[in-house]
Amino acid sequence: MAIENATNVVIRVADDGSSTNLQTLAFATSASLSMSSELRDSTTKSSGGWQENLAGLKSWELSGDAFIDLSGDTVTATDPYTGSSGTLKTVTKLWDLWAAGTKVDIEFGTGAGGSGDKSYTGEAFISSLSMEAGVEENATYSITLTGTGALAEA
């Protein structure tokens, strides 16, 4: 069994309608993928006192936290996905995408350092973007991307 080093798991976003131009979120400290299914109550009088359910709609969302860099839309830094220097998206670009209501392509998964290069892809909207800057603390932001349509395993 290969236990994944969480440092290798990243969120990548493309805003040009091309899932081939994905960029990792800059200076990320956490990444999370949540999937859920609604259940439809199908209990009948003959269920013997036990609730019965049928599968309903599925949904998913990504969330993450990162340090804030306000120097521009992107920054050149070591990309944990590729293991080499690359262009990473900053909170400034994410703000623009949120404000415009832009649908983005996403990928959640492991890159060059991962054990199996497994990833999940789909389309999403930025549904939440918050920034925090406490006294003598590192400025951070949190982002939630809510999926629209299917999440695919790649």
Where are the predicted features?
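Solvent-exposed edge beta-strands and adjacent loop segments
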Residues: 2-70, 119-144
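Short, acidic/charged, Gly/Pro-enriched secondary-structure junctions
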Residues: 76-123
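Hydrophobic residues in beta-strands and at strand termini
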Residues: 108, 145-147
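Hydrophobic lipid-interacting interfaces of membrane-associated proteins
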Residues: 148-152
